[in-house]
Amino acid sequence: MKRLFLFVGLIAWGSGALASRVERPNILWITSEDNNVNWVGCYGNEWVETPHIDGLAAEGFRYTEVYANAPVCAPSRSTWITGMYAVTMGTQPMRSRNVIPHDVIPYYPDLLRSVGYYVGNDNKTDYNIGGREDQSCWDNPTEVNWKRLKEQEPFFQVVNFYESHESRTQGDLVDIEHVAMETRLRAYHPDVPEIRQNYAKYHDAVKRMDRRVGEALAALEASGMADRTIVIYTSDHG
């Protein structure tokens, strides 16, 4: 299953002046849940509204051949935190929490901490690995605190948004902005009212998620750290 994965870097990163001034850039990693490339404007969806994600793509660059090796939430996140295949670690079954030797397979934030980074994770960990609490590798495993991040530079901060989770297609059509009958369906879905309703609700969910991305970027800008921060956006599997 293809997943959305797009990096946005400092545009002038190659310049000698900037490279000497920012030896270790901050890293803001924005993640969302379940949406794949078909639900984002910068990947060709002309109907969905994702101006903030599209803006990141226009300013930086995006990947077009990136795939989730374990396309379920927690197994996919186990590959993020270790850089290893889920089948290698035995974490591919959902909620398996297979124990791995952490002295041999460190978490990504462990490596960043070892070179002086302050590492934070905005509430959700869910890395599907046993033998160690997911929160133990973070300096701050709860909500993002921009003031603290500025005091602790350089930082690596994960911010996770739930709005695009597939469960947002459930429930009644209440306060839905997109019109179900105008929704463009994929060819592999039957054209029935229930599918159109799900599409309309999910378009709205992705739009709300994109607003949260915009809020995070605005907070980063207001903190005064945007010019020394690499921003990464990805969904967890799609």
Regions found by a protein language model. Give the residues of each.
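Formylglycine-dependent sulfatase
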Residues: K2, L18-G238
